């Protein structure tokens, strides 16, 4: 066994006769290729999970900002609703006063004329 290669119990030891079993070498090379492919896929998955975490943090921040904006919008909408209610009330009071004044202007001369 060569001292430059670390011991791996799953890899059979290399025989001194390199051409003795080419089938075994092909299988070993294929297994190593599959392992390398799997390691690459796992690294990609880990990177994607990290990116997903960053995006989730960004989305969470945006959701918080949206909730704050929604509260401000709700307060503004309530303020406008109250302002419009007061404006409508003032308009109704003005119309009521105009109707009362018109009735007084019409009824008082009639009552004075017939009395």
UniProtKB/Swiss-Prot annotation:
Vesicular side: 113-115
Stretches with biased composition (Low complexity): 1-16
Localization of this protein: Endomembrane system
Record-linked CDD domains: R-SNARE_Snc1 (cd15874)
InterPro entries linked: Synaptobrevin-like, Synaptobrevin/VAMP, V_SNARE_CC
Segments in the Cytoplasmic topological domain: 1-93
Main location class: membrane
TM region(s), chain numbering: 94-112
GO MF: molecular adaptor activity; SNAP receptor activity; syntaxin binding
Residue ranges of domain v-SNARE coiled-coil homology in the record: 27-87
Glycyl lysine isopeptide (Lys-Gly) (interchain with G-Cter in ubiquitin) cross-link site: 62
Entry comment on modification after translation: Palmitoylated by SWF1.
Covalent lipidation (S-palmitoyl cysteine), chain numbering: 94
Membrane topology type: Single-pass type IV membrane protein
Biased composition (Polar residues): 17-28
Pfam families: Synaptobrevin (PF00957)
Region annotation Disordered: where it falls in the sequence: 1-28
Residue positions where Phosphoserine is found in the record: 58
Gene Ontology CC, one term: transport vesicle membrane
Family statement: Belongs to the synaptobrevin family.
Further details from the record: Present with 300 molecules/cell in log phase SD medium.
Task of the protein: SNC1 and SNC2 are vesicle-targeting proteins essential for normal secretory traffic between the Golgi and the plasma membrane. They may also be involved in vesicle fusion.
Name this protein carries in UniProt: Synaptobrevin homolog 2
Gene: SNC2
């Amino acid at each position: 066994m060569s001292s430059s290669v670390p011991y791996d119990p799953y890899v059979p030891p290399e025989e001194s006769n390199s051409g003795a079993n080419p089938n075994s070498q092909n299988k070993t090379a294929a297994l190593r290729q599959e392992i390398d492919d799997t390691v690459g896929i796992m690294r990609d998955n880990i990177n994607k999970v990290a990116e997903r975490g960053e995006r989730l943090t960004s989305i969470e921040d945006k959701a918080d900002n949206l909730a704050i904006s929604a509260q401000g919008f709700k307060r503004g909408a309530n303020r406008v609703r109250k302002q419009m209610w007061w404006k409508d009330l003032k308009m109704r009071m003005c119309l009521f006063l105009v109707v009362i004044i018109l009735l007084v202007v019409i009824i008082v001369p009639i009552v004075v004329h017939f009395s």
